[in-house]
């Protein structure tokens, strides 16, 4: 049995940083080392209107919740903020067009409506990329931890950040709970050992 109280007190290091969108989403090494869709996370569910509203919030400089990561060696896993992370990524890659219905303050500006990131003026692209986002990174203080401890820490962080903030659907909670049952752990361990 994993003693989370001891682990969080003695083994976990928590670091809060402020990172530019540029450093998180245009750095190929960082992108390749970031898993933003771990198995316990729900799928990407934001429609284009909601995604546009979120991007508009960034342009307006409003405070957005931090992205929560778990770091192991040089790899990162998004524990909380998958919808935000993937929306920014899709926008920067040019896969998201800003919809007028999602632009509550910038909707009257022809500089934004119907455009993807690559179609924006250089001024707006630079402004977006320089925007700072808070990140919280959890990691183990040393290399002496088990896979069971790592999985327990990730589940605990995920459950705490998702308890009441943006309620998950019951099937999403069931999925997260299923991933910690003994049978699933057994298969995960044995498949990884092969």
Feature locations, PLM:
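Acidic, carboxylate-rich catalytic segments that either coordinate divalent cations
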Residues: 1-24, 28-32
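Basic- and aromatic-enriched surface patches that contact anionic nucleotides/nucleic acids
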Residues: 3-15, 38-194
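A short, surface-exposed helix-loop junction/capping segment
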Residues: 31-39
């Amino acid at each position: 049995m994993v003693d989370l109280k001891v682990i969080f007190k003695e083994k976990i290091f928590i670091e809060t940083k402020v990172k530019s969108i540029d450093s998180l989403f245009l750095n190929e090494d960082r992108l390749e080392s970031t898993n933003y869709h771990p198995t316990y996370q729900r799928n990407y569910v934001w429609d284009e209107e909601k995604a546009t509203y979120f991007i508009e919030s960034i342009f307006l400089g409003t405070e957005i919740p931090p992205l929560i990561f778990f770091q192991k060696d040089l790899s990162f896993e998004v524990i909380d903020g998958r919808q935000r992370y993937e929306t920014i990524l899709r926008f920067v890659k040019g896969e998201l067009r800003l919809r007028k219905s999602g632009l509550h303050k910038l909707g009257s500006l022809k500089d934004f409506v119907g455009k993807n990131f690559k179609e924006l003026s250089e001024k707006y692209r630079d402004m977006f990329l320089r925007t700072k986002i808070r990140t919280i990174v959890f990691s183990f203080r040393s290399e002496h931890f088990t896979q069971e401890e790592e999985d327990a820490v990730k589940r605990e962080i995920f459950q705490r950040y998702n308890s009441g903030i943006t309620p998950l659907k019951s099937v999403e909670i069931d999925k997260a709970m299923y991933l910690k049952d003994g049978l699933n752990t057994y298969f995960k361990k044995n498949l990884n050992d092969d």
